[in-house]
């Protein structure tokens, strides 16, 4: 009986390749598409869940472009979700439906709409995961190359959504260092509204990859129809809303393709990040609650567990780490009812001790002058003081003044034939996570710490530099445009390896403040640092904005 139940969970239900409605339903919302063999798949509806009678009355709108995944080439004035250069140089692509299927998961259904180019051996699968107990739908795309040679993807959105014109307003977050996540509301006007990121490593200091569309006027907290959308990606992104002479706005979201055209080799499949969609008739707060429920249950590590009250050493001592001082801080936080102490930057480096921010990143060995009893002594003191112990690392980075850089200068991201632009301390550089050897090294930083010191309960993972230099010493000259995408593919592989081995450790993603507040990172982390600004009054506004898309449990605080 158990075997039979398992088989049913994994069963794929094939649907006939003919004109039909494909319904993607969560607990209370529906996404309906028209899928007819040999024609483009088209949107019919997105909103509150429909019953059978409602479905019978749906028709494809004629006053807008309803293609579910519009391709470039035969309607060049229109915005496209997909554009490519075929192996013979042809820039035109046509996508028509060949059928659909549904796969049952434990708490969701995954609907796939199969598309292909009738002339070229290009297949595109539109994927929709609808959760059974929360009103969220994840939409992503998988593009497969069956041509004889390499094709070049120049535009590859995760998804497109048409929104009927009217009094439609967009709510989104923007800001800067120490003033992140400021909420703005703007009415959609004719033209293009673009939110994009080019940082390379982090992506939410200035703008966020999450938006809400209020369909009945300026967004209200508890009333009105609202569409929420979040691109679950840790790297460069682009959200674009196009309003032209039709009756619709067209919302596109995906990886920012600027300087990132992707060469898809024969037999390969490219998978986009997911665009997470929700809908609510209970205003902005209703959409927020959907994000919170989904994130806590299906994305965040330990999303159902209370976070410990912690003290971090940074604001107290900065780089002035020492054994006695750490012991005293542990005693102090315990006396105030705290449960966790986190030792921040400044604890490492042998040949180049970390006395300030220009040395030792990559040399993850204890500075025994500062900490003569090592991490063992810190763990002993934590136990004595009745608190857990956590530690700071920045494993994606190095300094030119480090043993790591001396051994592996070929591991850094650097433009060929040019001096590298350096970051913090005048020496910081970014390691190339597209390189499998670098991935092994970064995994090893965490693995070594947690293998030697399994009592470590918490890791603060920082990232204090953007990719300033476009150049991978690992990728071929022809594939240099893969740099940003390869970096985040490598980042995801590392986080997956860490989580597979260390499920219980709590990990915070920090990035010069709130630069990694995104659902792409949170798939492997417990929380993110909201801002380096810890002023209590100013934090209210930043956490208020952040709360539109992220639950309070995801906002780290110390």
Predicted segments, located by residue:
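Short Pro-Gly-centered flexible turn/kink motifs
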Residues: 22, 84, 91-97, 262-281
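N-terminal signal peptide c-region/cleavage motif recognized by signal peptidases
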Residues: 14-16
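Sec-dependent signal peptide recognition
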Residues: 2-9
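Active-site and adjacent substrate-binding regions of carbohydrate-active enzymes
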Residues: 28, 141-143, 318, 349, ...
């Amino acid at each position: 009986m158990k075997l039979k139940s398992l088989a049913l969970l994994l069963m794929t239900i094939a649907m006939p390749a003919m004109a039909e409605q494909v319904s993607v339903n969560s607990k209370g919302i529906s996404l309906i598409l028209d899928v007819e063999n040999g024609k483009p798949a088209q949107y019919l509806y997105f909103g509150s869940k429909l019953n059978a009678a409602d479905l019978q009355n749906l028709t494809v709108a004629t006053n807008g472009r309803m293609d579910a995944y519009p391709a470039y080439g035969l309607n060049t004035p229109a915005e496209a979700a997909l554009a490519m250069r075929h192996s013979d140089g042809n820039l035109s692509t046509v996508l028509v439906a060949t059928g659909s299927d549904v796969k049952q998961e434990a708490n969701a259904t995954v609907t796939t709409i199969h598309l292909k180019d009738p002339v070229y051996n290009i297949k595109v699968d539109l994927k929709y995961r609808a959760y059974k107990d929360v009103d969220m739908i994840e939409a992503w795309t998988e593009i497969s190359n069956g041509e004889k040679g390499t094709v070049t993807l120049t535009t590859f959105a995760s998804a497109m959504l048409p929104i009927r014109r009217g009094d439609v307003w967009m709510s989104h977050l923007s800001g800067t260092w120490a003033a992140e996540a400021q909420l703005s509301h703007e009415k959609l006007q004719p033209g293009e509204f673009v939110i994009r990121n080019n940082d390379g490593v982090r992506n939410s200091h200035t703008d966020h990859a999450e938006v809400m569309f209020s369909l009945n006027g300026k967004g209200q907290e508890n009333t009105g129809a609202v569409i929420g959308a979040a691109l679950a990606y840790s790297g460069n992104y682009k959200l674009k809303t196009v309003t032209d002479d039709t009756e619709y706005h067209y919302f596109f979201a995906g990886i920012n393709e600027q300087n990132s055209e992707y060469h898809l080799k024969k037999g390969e499949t490219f998978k986009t990040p997911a665009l997470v969609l929700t809908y609510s008739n209970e205003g902005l707060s209703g959409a927020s609650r959907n994000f919170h429920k989904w994130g806590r249950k299906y994305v965040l590590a330990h999303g159902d567990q209370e976070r410990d009250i912690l003290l971090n050493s940074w604001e107290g001592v900065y780089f002035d780490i020492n054994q006695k001082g750490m012991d005293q801080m542990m005693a102090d936080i315990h006396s105030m009812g705290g449960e966790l102490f986190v030792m921040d930057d400044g604890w490492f480096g042998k040949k180049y001790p970390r006395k300030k921010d220009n040395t030792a990143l990559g040399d993850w060995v204890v500075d025994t002058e500062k900490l003569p009893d090592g991490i063992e002594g810190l763990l002993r003191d934590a136990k004595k003081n009745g608190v857990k112990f956590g530690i700071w690392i920045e494993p994606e980075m190095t300094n030119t003044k480090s043993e790591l850089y001396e051994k592996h200068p070929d591991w850094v991201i650097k433009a060929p034939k040019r001096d590298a632009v350096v970051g913090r301390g005048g020496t910081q550089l970014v390691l190339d996570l597209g390189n499998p050897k670098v991935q092994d090294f970064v995994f090893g930083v965490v693995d070594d710490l947690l293998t030697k010191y399994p009592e470590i309960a918490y890791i603060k993972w920082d990232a204090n530099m953007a990719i300033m230099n476009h150049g991978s010493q690992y990728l071929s000259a022809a594939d240099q445009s893969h740099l940003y995408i390869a970096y985040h593919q490598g980042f995801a592989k590392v986080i997956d390896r860490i989580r597979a081995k260390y499920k219980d450790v709590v990990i915070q993603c920090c990035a010069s403040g709130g630069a990694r507040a995104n659902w792409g990172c949170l798939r492997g982390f417990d929380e993110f640092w909201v801002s380096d600004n810890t002023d209590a009054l100013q934090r209210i506004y930043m956490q208020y904005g952040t709360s539109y898309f992220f639950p309070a449990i995801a906002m780290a605080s110390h």
